[in-house]
Design a protein with these regions (language model features):
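Short acidic (Asp/Glu) and glycine-rich catalytic loops that position anionic groups and cofactors
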Residues: 212-216, 234-243, 284-289, 318-324, ...
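Short, small-residue-biased leader/transition segments that mark boundaries at the very start
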Residues: 1-3
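Conserved N-terminal alpha-helix of the aminotransferase class I/II PLP-enzyme fold
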Residues: 13-56
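Conserved PLP-enzyme active-site core in the AAT-like
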Residues: 7, 43-46, 56-276
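Short, surface-exposed ligand-recognition loops at beta-strand->loop->(often short) alpha-helix junctions
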Residues: 293-300
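PLP-dependent enzyme catalytic core of the Aspartate aminotransferase-like
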Residues: 300, 304, 308-312, 317-448
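Conserved glycine-rich beta-strand-loop-beta hairpin in the small C-terminal domain of fold type I
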Residues: 257-258, 275-292, 324
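N-terminal glycine-rich anion-binding loops that anchor highly charged ligand groups
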Residues: 6-14
Length: 448
């Protein structure tokens, strides 16, 4: 057991206050919360900002609920975060999925391109929204400005998952932010990169195409009636820090990232992602604070590299079978960081093995027939059946493999013999299974 005084000090405990008139009401803000929202909206150039205390998952749910109506069609990249599926279920939306491009040399999923968005509107002119995740976890940014213009030309709104971009737009060293590029709403994980506490997020909204009362009602619906004032205070503090020092923080982050990149480039045979993917698969820019290395080219896996680095006192941001991702922030711009960067490079160089043949990247199958919406599939009765015998049944859960990490099947879609056979082939090649409750694929959940 760990006592509270070992976790937080007296000031933090005293700040964990109950609801009082002086502290405003997050559901009907008129005082200090309203002022915090107003200041955050000014910083990001939005018409309204909502404080999120249930992470960006809650903010994405509120964004989808407030922007659209049940039955509306929305264009969704196939590799969107799991919170988007939750929002589709809650809001009763009909997704039109699109496969983002996949870069085989780097073994990375790229972005949704303007051309894909245009093609989607040509086929589905009744689309009410485009959902875009930019930048993605690896810092690859989409052409948000062009996609916003296309959506608006067709009378639709652009909703952005900007979880990995709350710091964008404060410096020319970084890609522009979603609101600057014309998005109608953007969900930002203020806790991921800038200085707010875990669980802190913001929803930026531009009115005109979105109704104020609908967004307010939706955010109230997904927000607790007992919000933690430490979290809301942390959001306001992060906003103030960005307003005062955003450009300097960006410059510090880029300096530190450059130090790390130089050290990693000295490791023979180790690819370090720079700007070579710009102009491919809808990617127009890279967040320089995200440093991605392809360790599979050293004959090792991502988890092997991450374990070795952890033993050396280095925690990484993200790992998959091929890559290790380092998140470099302004806090890393210090005299000790060059030695840390060199330690990382030394660990990796010592791990080099004779290069192994990488498992082939599986071809992308066509998106299966959508029989039911995600909401209909969620509430439908289900049963578990042998996966090999599930052809013709409607999926009750998601199935994907890494690489490339794009779902082969989503809830409400029909399983086919081709898809099942393909999945079993990928499993035999020991690609990582993700999604189903039974990762062995002996059984799979389907609708009754």
């Amino acid at each position: 057991m760990c006592s509270s005084d070992l976790l937080v000090g007296d000031v933090a405990l005293e700040s964990d206050v109950s609801l009082m008139e002086e502290l405003d009401d997050i559901h009907h803000p008129e005082g200090c919360i309203r002022e915090a929202e107003k200041l955050a909206a000014e910083v990001y150039g939005s018409d309204r900002c909502f404080l999120g205390v249930n992470g960006t998952t809650g903010v994405i749910h509120g964004m989808l609920l407030g922007a659209l109506r049940p039955g509306d069609r929305i264009l969704v990249p196939r590799n969107s975060h799991r919170s988007v599926l939750g929002g589709l279920i809650l809001a009763g939306l009909e997704p039109v999925y699109v496969q983002p491009a996949y870069e085989e040399e780097w073994r990375l999923t790229l972005q949704l391109s303007p051309e894909q968005v245009e093609a989607a509107f040509a086929r589905y002119p009744d689309l009410k929204a485009v959902f875009l995740t930019t930048p993605n976890y690896f810092g690859l940014a989409a052409d948000t400005k062009r996609i916003a213009a296309i959506a608006h030309e067709h009378g639709a709104v652009l909703l952005v998952d900007e979880a990995h971009g709350p710091h964008l737009g404060f410096s020319d060293l970084l890609p522009p932010g979603a609101m600057e590029c014309g998005a109608d709403a953007a969900a930002q994980s203020t806790h991921k990169i800038v200085g707010a506490m875990t669980q802190c997020s913001l929803l930026q909204v531009r009115y005109g195409r979105l109704r104020p009362e609908a967004m307010e009602q939706a955010m109230s619906l997904v927000t607790t009636t007992s919000p933690n004032y430490l979290l809301m205070g942390a959001l306001d503090g992060a906003r103030a820090q960005l307003a005062e020092k955003g450009a300097a923080m960006a410059a510090a982050s880029v300096r530190a990232a450059t130090v790390l990149r130089k050290a990693l480039h000295r490791v023979p045979g180790l690819p370090v992602l720079e700007k070579e993917l710009n102009g491919r698969g809808g990617v127009v820019a890279l967040d320089p604070g995200k440093v991605t290395i392809q360790v599979s080219r050293l004959g090792i896996t991502g988890p092997e590299a991450a374990d070795a680095l952890r033993r050396a006192g280095i925690a990484v941001e993200l790992v998959d079978q091929d890559h290790v991702l380092f998140l470099v922030t302004y806090a890393d711009d210090n005299p000790e960081f060059p030695a840390i960067a060199q330690r990382i490079a030394t660990v990796l160089e010592k791990m080099r093995k004779p290069r192994r043949d990488l498992p082939p990247v599986p071809p992308v199958l066509s998106i299966p027939e959508q029989v039911l919406t995600p909401r209909e599939a969620f509430f439908a009765p289900k049963e578990r059946v042998p996966f090999r015998e599930a052809a013709g049944r409607v999926a009750g859960e998601t199935l994907s493999f890494y690489p490339p990490g794009i779902p082969l099947i989503m809830p409400g879609e029909r399983l086919t013999k081709e898809l099942i056979a393909f999945s079993l082939q990928l499993q035999e090649k020991r690609l990582q299974v993700s999604g189903p409750r039974d990762p062995s694929l002996q059984t799979f959940e389907v609708l009754v």
